């Protein structure tokens, strides 16, 4: 119920604003409604190409999650690799991207690579908003 209502409100906001800024949240609502393929459709839409870099990262994280929902861990990894994976990035969106990538690698059984990317996530998350260090200890 709530996902459906949220999606309707987001669609209305998108119509009023005329821009793509709500795509990542809309895609996440589609996932919440059990429609991961719709989330991926939104990530592939023409509007998605208009997003700023940070919003593209958020949409890629959602699309990767949708691929994982469908059992496609390798597809999730590839989805995240479409973003700027430069280790020198320092914004919180980089920490979230690196974390999502590390998590997908861990699920795929690629533990050494997962450790490397959880470390990178922790390095650009000085406020420890994410649990990257704890995930490192678990691996």
Range-by-range predicted roles:
Residues 16, 49, 78-84, 109-130, ...:
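TPR/TPR-like (Sel1-like) alpha-helical repeat modules
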């Amino acid at each position: 119920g709530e996902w459906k209502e949220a999606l309707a409100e987001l669609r209305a906001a998108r119509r009023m604003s005329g821009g793509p800024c709500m795509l990542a949240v809309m895609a996440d609502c589609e996932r919440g409604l059990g429609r991961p393929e719709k989330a991926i459709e939104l990530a592939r839409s023409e509007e998605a190409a208009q997003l700023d870099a940070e919003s593209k990262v958020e949409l890629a994280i959602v699309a990767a999650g949708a691929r994982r929902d469908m059992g496609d861990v390798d597809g999730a990894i590839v989805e995240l690799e479409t973003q700027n994976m430069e280790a020198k990035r320092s914004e919180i969106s980089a920490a979230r991207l690196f974390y999502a990538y590390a998590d997908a690698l861990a699920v795929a059984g690629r533990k050494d690579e997962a450790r490397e990317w959880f470390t990178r996530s922790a390095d650009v998350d000085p406020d420890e908003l994410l649990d990257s260090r704890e995930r490192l200890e678990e691996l």
